[in-house]
Amino acid sequence: MDADINSIEWDAPIAPGVSMAAIPLHASFSDLDAVLATHLIDADAQLYRFEGGPDLRLERYGPDEHGNGGFLFSLPGDDLAGDMAALSITIEGWVVRALKVYALGLPPDIVAGKSYRGLAGGKVGLGSLVSDFLGFTELHFDEAEEWFCSGDDYGVLEISGWGVPLEDEPGQVVTAICVVA
């Protein structure tokens, strides 16, 4: 599996079980950290700008001695959205294990346009209908976690809507997407 990382892109496709934002699952922490350094625009404020994306503030968690930790990128507090999570990266054993993007409001909110714009299957992303994923994979609702999981045929993808089954709210929109190794 190719886990090279060269850039982080705010409109790169979502590849379930493979990558999101041009960040491959299984990329090494050191390679990711080196690429992150190229996107730093203000060291004092810990602001980063990815290709095609808004300015985001970074909070680092670890890594600890076992290589577990993560990164949380959020819109800065002075933005209309406040401190809204935009992208989280989970590191386990010194490699990327999960990538999650969050909707920053929904249209017509002005901040909705700052949300990650990558699409799965070339047509479904944040703000789309959850049911649009049914065009290329089964969805299983996890009652305990209150999210949808893709079918085995599609790769590991977790989709957040409104925390209820589609039968209860067929018009729910995608509020977060996570690719998992």
Predicted regions and their residues:
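Short helix/turn-capping signatures at newly exposed starts of structured segments
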Residues: 1-181
